[in-house]
Regions:
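C-terminal edge-of-domain segments
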Residues: 159-199
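Acidic, low-complexity glycine/serine/threonine-rich segments
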Residues: 95-157
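Helix N-cap and loop-to-helix transition residues
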Residues: 58-59, 123, 160
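Short, surface-exposed charged micro-motifs
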Residues: 65, 72-74, 151, 161, ...
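A generic structural signal for short, non-catalytic loop/turn and secondary-structure boundary residues
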Residues: 68, 145-147, 164-166
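A glycine- and small-residue-enriched flexible loop/hinge signal that marks low-structured segments
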Residues: 1-112, 155
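Generic alpha-helical propensity signal that fires on short helical segments
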Residues: 36-42, 51-53, 124, 170-172, ...
């Protein structure tokens, strides 16, 4: 729960879901859907209804404890920030919200962008055009740093003569999403190697 100001100056407690949705929409518009909303300032909020301990250099805080159990929270540091990257997925590939959202966006975009391809004649040119359109989209996402890479292909084992005769054509694609730097570790090493540079 979060506190915000009412028009009359009083404070109102509200659930954070609308603020988080707004933060995600703002992040999508300003940075891209592939960025994590974690560590971003939530606007229009005075403070969390229940303070959560947090320090940038202390892993043993309430905020980090909650994050270990896939619970995002809010912390106070130069504003009220959403703190937490993780989903409740049991499959570790989908543990980060930004990775899940990237996959969803790619899948939805491909379906919408290929409405033109439904009910077209399945020819070699058709298969090549669809494959190249998907690959062009994946290259564009890579150029934007939305993904690290990806590729589309038509698998001949699935696209049998019978499948094509039944009006089915299969396009596989893969991609790698960038993962958020949830834990940054700086390791300090005191050495005498640079003493020689004094003279």
């Amino acid at each position: 729960m979060l506190f915000r100001s009412a028009r009359d100056g009083s404070e109102i407690v509200e659930p954070p879901s609308a603020r988080v949705a707004g933060l995600i929409a703002q992040s999508d518009a300003e940075r891209g859907f592939w960025f994590s909303p974690s560590n971003q300032v939530v606007t229009g909020v005075l403070r969390p209804a229940r303070p959560v301990s947090w320090a940038i250099n202390d892993p043993n805080t309430q905020a980090n404890y909650l994050n270990e159990f896939s619970v995002a929270t809010f912390v106070s540091h130069d504003g009220i920030r959403l703190w937490g990257n993780r989903t409740c997925a049991t499959d570790s590939r989908w543990a980060f919200l930004s990775v899940r959202r990237t996959a969803d966006m790619i899948n939805e975009s491909l379906v919408k962008a290929h409405l033109w391809a439904v009910d077209r004649n399945i020819t070699r040119t058709y298969v090549e055009e669809v494959t190249e359109m998907v690959n062009a989209y994946l290259r564009q996402l890579k150029a934007q740093a939305a993904i690290l890479g990806g590729r589309c292909w038509a698998d001949p084992e699935l696209n049998t003569a019978q499948a094509i005769a039944d009006g089915r054509v299969y396009f596989d694609f893969d991609f790698t999403a960038p993962y958020p730097a949830e834990h940054i570790v700086f390791r300090s090493h005191l050495v005498g190697d640079y003493l020689e540079e004094i003279l």
